[in-house]
């Protein structure tokens, strides 16, 4: 009976999380900097570095696997200093994001005047902050080191199945967490530590 109540409460929290999480995220943006940037942010930063159109357009119009994107980014790092500055994990995160979202359905005509933080699709970090705080704080998620299969298993449990995410979003979220979760608790601000909470 208690388990049913717990699941029901979690389900209700999931339903209302879309309304509650965004203000929370806005209020704690500085505190959440310990969570690694997702592909949307990394790609936005590359665009902000003002690469030539010849270098930028292939990033927005190509269709490749994560491995192919990773090789492409390495091959273009000399021409794209913003890519060269990324560490291995960030490059892998960006390649993963590109594999999910490129090519864009439509490339803006005026790329220089486009607000890319709004134009680009959400990344795994965005999805975690938008959807993973209905029943617990985000720290419960990002401090765990798990396989993709394990993450997808959790996302399919009754308490998580009610969260409004597409299968593709769930897959992308799991992939982001494989690359970026497992953050040591010492790197988490004390006010956001989960006191040992887990799934």
Question: What are the residue ranges of the model-derived segments?
Answer:
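Positively charged n-region of N-terminal signal peptides that target proteins for export
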Residues: 1-5
